[in-house]
Amino acid sequence: MAPKAEKKPASKAPAEKKPAAKKTASSDSKKRTKTRKETYSSYIYKVLKQTHPDTGISQKAMSIMNSFVNDIFERVASEASKLAAYNKKSTISAREIQTAVRLILPGELAKHAVSEATRTITKYSSAAN
């Protein structure tokens, strides 16, 4: 027997082949479930229909709007998290969210966002009781 050469780093060797398991009728009939992708599409569509009932929206525009909502959500959440950390609090409250919105959105847009949020929360609270 010849002397063995130095060992090289293991490369991706194929795994040992095992005899194939027999497929049963039940495993063939199972369908793969689609992975769910959560979007704001239905909510964006509802708001669109409230404001402009006769207007539609394309898939591309809906994708852009979804990205926009995700981006704003991340910005507000990140800013609120920083504010909570500055104040040595471990919980993000409505106050941190409101302050984050005021810091992120410019001028009139922030004022309208805060007033709409306050109005909506009041409406929700009164409906829950």
From Swiss-Prot:
Pfam families: Histone. There is a cross-link at residue 123 (Glycyl lysine isopeptide (Lys-Gly) (interchain with G-Cter in ubiquitin)). GO terms for cellular component: nucleosome; nucleus. It comes from the Eukaryota. The keyword Ubl conjugation applies. Residues 1-19 have a biased composition (Basic and acidic residues). CDD domains: HFD_H2B. SMART domains: H2B. The modification Phosphoserine is found at residue 11. Core component of nucleosome. Nucleosomes wrap and compact DNA into chromatin, limiting DNA accessibility to the cellular machineries which require DNA as a template. Histones thereby play a central role in transcription regulation, DNA repair, DNA replication and chromosomal stability. DNA accessibility is regulated via a complex set of post-translational modifications of histones, also called histone code, and nucleosome remodeling. This is Histone H2B.2.
